[in-house]
């Protein structure tokens, strides 16, 4: 397949912008580390930081079986870092706004560098913990809908369970899925809908951890129905995914 020059230019621009953002974040963390860490080494910081920042991309490179666990680790760490990068960028920009005001007035002291860096990194850690707890704790929200149409069998009320954007993969695994299945089955739904993005992108962890078997434990009187989402298409294994879902009904 011939790669279009426009595509190469676009990817180059995106990588350049991504690298610039990560250098900005890394520079701040390195500055803070140099002030508080005894024996700080630029190489000891920047090499692990680069692996973390590009982990999501590096983890997608095909590897021999012996190295696949390392690739999965990079991808998981890189996925978490994407969240850290987004929050860190906003917080460091805010800290730099204050820093600019100080620089224009009395100058920036090392105490501010240490203090602001500690606050930013502490907030990132706190938000990461809260976000992880929310992501791995299924929340049930109830909505009542009225439809002016009789249901089959004369039943006037149906309980429909809808779970979208589950993103099963290396980060969201079988343990989370079991909790989700238990919560849904406890509702005793008449119908279960999975409207897309059941898997994150790669089908490999879905197959390796036999997550379809856990999904097969979903119970509803009128069945379980799933459709494809954009992340299923990202992985490029649509036939295998459909076949695996059909095996469990």
PLM region descriptions:
Residues 1-136:
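Non-catalytic terminal accessory segments
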Residues 81-83, 132-138, 228-239:
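Hydrophobic transmembrane alpha-helix bundles
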Residues 114-115, 124-150, 170-175, 236:
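Hydrophobic alpha-helical transmembrane segments in integral membrane proteins
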Residues 146-249:
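Soluble catalytic domains of enzymes that build or remodel membrane lipids, polysaccharides, and related
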């Amino acid at each position: 397949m011939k790669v279009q020059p426009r595509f190469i230019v676009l990817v180059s621009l995106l990588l350049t912008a991504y690298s610039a953002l990560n250098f900005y974040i890394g520079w701040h963390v390195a500055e803070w580390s140099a002030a508080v860490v005894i024996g700080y080494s630029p190489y000891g910081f920047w090499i692990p930081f680069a692996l973390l920042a590009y982990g999501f991309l590096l983890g997608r490179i095909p590897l021999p079986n012996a190295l696949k666990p390392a690739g999965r680790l990079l991808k998981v760490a890189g996925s978490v870092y994407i969240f850290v990068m987004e929050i860190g960028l906003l917080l460091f920009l805010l800290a730099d706004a204050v820093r600019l005001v100080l620089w224009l007035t009395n100058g920036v002291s090392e105490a501010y560098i240490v203090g602001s860096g500690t606050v930013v990194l502490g907030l990132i850690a706190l938000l990461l913990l809260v976000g992880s707890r929310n992501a791995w704790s299924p929340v049930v929200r109830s909505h009542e809908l009225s439809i002016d149409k009789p249901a089959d069998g004369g039943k006037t009320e149906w309980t429909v369970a809808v779970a979208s954007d589950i993103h099963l993969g290396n980060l969201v695994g079988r343990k989370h899925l079991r909790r989700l299945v238990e919560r849904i089955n406890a509702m005793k739904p008449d119908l279960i809908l999975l409207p897309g993005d059941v898997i994150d992108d790669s089908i490999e962890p879905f197959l390796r951890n036999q997550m379809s078997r856990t999904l097969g434990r979903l119970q509803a009187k009128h069945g379980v129905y799933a459709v494809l989402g954009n992340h299923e298409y990202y992985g490029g294994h649509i036939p295998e995914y459909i076949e695996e879902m059909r095996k469990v009904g």
